Amino acid sequence: DKDRPGYDYTAFFARSGLMADLAPAGGVPLIPVGGIGDHSVAVALAGGIAASLFKRERTGEGEKVDVSLLQSATFIGCTGVLNGFNGRKLPRDRYDCGHAGSNTYQGSDGEWFYLAVIDYRRFPEFCQVIGLPEIASDPRFNTVDAYYKNKAELTHIFDKKFAEHPVSYWHELLEEHDLPHEILRHFKDVPDDPQVQANHYMYPYEYKDGTKTVFSNGPVHFSSIDPAEIPCKISGPIGRDTAQVLEELGYTQAEIAAMYENKEIR
């Protein structure tokens, strides 16, 4: 299939199972945003290049580094691939997740958060904190086996409880007791996230016409470089360096001018 046309939507998301099996059962397939597959490949390729340069430094031998969208997707989604290979029915809905302590829940404000009380030993404490102490001793949930077996029923109970207050209320309560969770943020919220700002994960940028935007920083920080001091520069308009590159390749200015006139380049 090396000659087939494709994008990260097709080769990364559709071909790998991510698009079909990450979305809830009974609904439409996952609708990804562009570039996730491309960025995943870029990170993998950077690591491969670094490793091959290290090998060349040590042995004098080079490497041809190859990374594909499908290969990166099967690596990222390997847990799902193994689940499917071993007979796990996918996609699944919220009531068929691993257990009720690791699931998404909706507050009264319509927003969602992810509950990650994965350790069953904290289940009684969690029930006490959210105001359902009787659940911890309920025969349907008071053993590990029963807890997993009756996960759908318990999820419905939690659904009703968490619908009593907005997500911010539950966030503060769970945070106070150091119970793992996270609010489901929206993309629009990310640039204002205090953690993102403190670590310079994104850069604000203003174009010459006054338009403001943000750019994502790379996912790796080096101790010798202060991310706050890294300048954010844009690449410029398409074709900005075309003439320079052609000159470096040996074309004359007259030949380049003819290419522009014939609309062979821009």
Tell me what each language-model feature is.
Residues 103-108, 202-208:
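Short acidic-hydrophobic surface loop/beta-edge motif
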